[in-house]
Amino acid sequence: MRMAVTQNPWQGRVDSGEVGDTTRLFRIVNTLESSEAKTLGGSPVLLGFGCDAGVLRNQGRAGAAHGPDAIRQALANVPAHGLPALYDAGNIACEHGDLESAQLALAGSVHNILSRGGFPLVLGGGHEVAWGTWQGLRAHLDARNDDGRLLIINIDAHFDLRTSRPASSGTPFDQIANACAERGQPFDYVCLGVSRLSNTPALFSRAHALGVSYVEDVDMQERHLASRLAELAARIDATDHVYLTIDLDALPATVMPGVSAPAAYGVPLPVVEEIALLARRSGKLRAADLAEYNPQYDRDNLGARVAARLAWRLLG
């Protein structure tokens, strides 16, 4: 189920004639094998989820399976700016559309990274990635007998609370809600950037029934940023652990064309970036992922560079 990164995306510019620190990420990244006993000391670890089977099940457009390596290529040439270490754990493949096995493999890899003291940043792949990442984080907390509160922050145009099965990119947070209920644990879910035009009344009803906190895209613009950050900071202060997942289709299509479902309105990039920084600087962010980047529909690699920028913000 684990596959190597293809065609070595970790290549970039060497500024041999310049004076001073010209180190770029491709110069510091190291591969990480799941069998290694290395202790990671909080270092970020990239993990690809090369899967769009859930997107296809959700009647979306194929192509997100190629997202992880495209984001790596965009990251490779980014200046390291003092980042001491970066690891790459390769990609999880989805073979023959077997989404469930791919999600279990992802969960195992996330758990492995966390158990070794790393910070997993998962590169999707469709938003079905969230079910795998959450399972891996939950398994890690269980192994430590840690019953602290876990806050899920999802920046997304969609609730992804569909109750239909088989599971898809539209069901991960319903699956998480059901798992929390079975375990007798709270389902602390905040969804930021919800589009009223992309979610049916049934999905809003489901969100209300589950006690989901959400903010619509019209209230996630730059003029609202200070209020949103204050509200989110209060939520983070009241929890023990944070899982951040960013569905890139929350961004306006002018900024993020490379997704299955481009947003006509969307949440501005500066707002998304500030939320990511708030989560990272809280000291409570345990895992994060970037979902739905689809290079097949990108324009001039703009979406890849935007995804890489958000990834870079989460690395340090």
From Swiss-Prot:
GO molecular function terms noted in the UniProt entry: agmatinase activity; formimidoylglutamase activity; manganese ion binding
One Gene Ontology term from the biological process aspect of the record: L-histidine catabolic process to glutamate and formamide
Catalytic activity: N-formimidoyl-L-glutamate + H2O = formamide + L-glutamate
Coiled coil stretches, renumbered: none
Binding site for Mn(2+) 1: H127, D156, D160, D247
Cofactor annotation: Mn(2+)
The keyword Hydrolase is annotated on this UniProt entry: yes
Pathway(s): Amino-acid degradation; L-histidine degradation into L-glutamate; L-glutamate from N-formimidoyl-L-glutamate (hydrolase route): step 1/1
Signal sequence annotation: none
Note accompanying the cofactor annotation: Binds 2 manganese ions per subunit.
Keywords in alphabetical order: Histidine metabolism, Hydrolase, Manganese, Metal-binding
EC number assigned by the record: 3.5.3.8
Gene3D superfamilies: Ureohydrolase domain
InterPro entries on file: HutG, Ureohydrolase, Ureohydrolase_dom_sf, Ureohydrolase_Mn_BS
Family: Belongs to the arginase family.
Entry-linked PANTHER family: ARGINASE/AGMATINASE, FORMIMIDOYLGLUTAMASE
Name the record gives this protein: Formimidoylglutamase
Lineage: Bacteria, Pseudomonadati, Pseudomonadota, Betaproteobacteria, Burkholderiales
Gene expressing this chain: hutG
